[in-house]
Amino acid sequence: MSGMTRRLRRRGSWSAAPFAVALLISALLPAGAAAQEEASSSSSSASSSSDRLLEAARDGAVEVVRALVADGADGADVNAARGDGMTALHFAAERGHAAVARVLIDAGAAVDAGTRIGRYAPLHLAARGGHGPVVALLLEAGADPNAATTNSGVTALHLAAAAAVDGRSAVAALLDHGADPNAREGSAGQTPLMFAAAANRPAAAAALLEAGADPGTPTAVVDVLPSLALDREANRRMRDMIGAPRETLGPYGPEVDSEAEWPGEPTPAHVQAAIRAQREFLRSGFDVGEVSAHSLGRTGPDYPGGPDLIRPPYREVLVGRTGGMTALLHAAREGHIEAATALLDGGANIDQASADATTPLLMAALNGQFDLALALIERGADPDLAASTDGATPLFAVLQTQWAPKSNYPQPRAQDLQDAGHMDVLRALLDAGADPNPRLNTHLWYWEYGLTKMGIDLTGATPFWRAAFAQDIEAMKLLVAHGADPNIPTRWPEVGMRERRQQDGRQQEDSALPWIPEGAPNAWPIHAAAGGGYLGLGAFSVRNRPDQFIPAVKYLIEELGADVDQRDSWLYTPMHYAASRGDNELIEYLVSQGGDVTAITRLGQSTADMARGGRAGFFTRVPFPETVDLLTSLGATLECLHTHFLDTGDSCPGAGIDDPWAPAATSQEGKR
């Protein structure tokens, strides 16, 4: 007999063994053990029935459910749950199977059973799906209409208010059974009315308002600087705890072994305990005291060897405050005209602003919701109310949104989906009496979606300046027709609140020239129109009308009297900006209007230098040889190839000569 045959026979000889062993064990087992095995088999059968019950409830198979719960001692456990805590009643509620839910409730299903995470009851799931009949059934069976989930703190009414299908019937059932129309969820204090507004559920919003929902309730307000101070303190404490002897963490969890020797690296349990302690600290209401931009600033040089500066937390200072969002602000952000109309008809204040004084009209403009912006203007929204931080008004916001810089990643473009164009909104705002000349208080934190490529600072910019930066000549003319001043420049903020990247492409201001004073004029509209912002990486981010450089500059010079040789704060002229883009046609036009091709910048570069392709910090400009030839033929000199950038050796001999920001010749005060 071969080995293979022996193996096959051996394998075959064992094939009947389980049956023989089972018979033998059955014969030898005492009566009690046999009964125990029978009970185990019965338990397995019940477990199987419970699994089938969960599936049948999910699928809406009411007859199967009825049969399974009617099997007496052998029937399914009506409250059996999966590992996530979902019972048959949860599934029936989630899918809207009212008949199944009735059978389960009659069989003793617990109406307030909660899931493992969040303790979502069947009522929450039915409300989220907008299943009004199931919601009513659960409430009649004793479900708590105000029970909140433990993770987000939402009630069933929050979820019903946002439901896409038949949400109003679910909302009505909940309100009829005592649900609080002004309940707040746990993260930001949002109400059911805010959920309805954000999801554009006008019928649900109307029902909530009729039941006493307050349209003026705001979300929680966060003062960003104190919040930053608290976060820093929490992080400091956590780092100290992780770096401390392990036994000091004993009170934060029994898993911490206070007897073990300190190994030099924290264990996962050690880190987890520190994180838990940090969370407890953040919830403790710790008072950080008085804080300011300067007290939270970092002191040090921007570059090796540079002067010490106090750098306040830049974006946090610009943001200032968050929250204070009403239901109408939620609708405005999403552009939901129907929900906004329901809210206004129900008594919402059309001008109630958020924590940073953003009104619904400004919110709509900032988010490209131009159709809703027009509707708000028609209903009497104030066109001049500005944000309290940056001072942006709806007029500026419309232009900023329309011509928002390009980004490395996709950004919302709701304005592309509107029936109204940006000119329609600008015209409506101006016709409603909007001031055409408000200036920004600060730079906009959302200017480049959090990036800083251009080095442009918008402090002091007007709507006209913003239109000029985009070469939006139609908007420029409309603004002037309504009284816009075309000669208002941007201005410099305090030194510590300036972008590190400079508008000529340098990574930081390291020219060693005196600081330009706070409040000093920076760039005029003619610089913006001629190509200001194109000297560095910003050239790849600008969104504008590239075919309108010359018409925009001509309009400024010929119709508005702009100075063809206007110097900005770094002594660039419109000619410099045209040269940096290789725009020979604009150069020739500027020369025809008396433009000076021999002008030298504060950093010591000529107009021709701007077209030579030299370095500006880590950025190398595109060379335009034909532009260099044109300018030199017109009298421009070649002074310095690379932009003055002291620490790299790219220093221009003419930098700082005739510097308007230099102290008196006999004093070196202010030199760096």
Placement of each model-derived feature along the sequence:
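N-terminal segments that cap or nucleate solenoid repeat domains
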Residues: E37-A39, A46-F91, A327, A331, ...
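Start-of-repeat signature of ankyrin repeats
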Residues: S49, G85, G118-R119, S152-G153, ...
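Conserved ankyrin/ankyrin-like repeat signature
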Residues: V64, A99-V100, P133-V134, S169-A170, ...
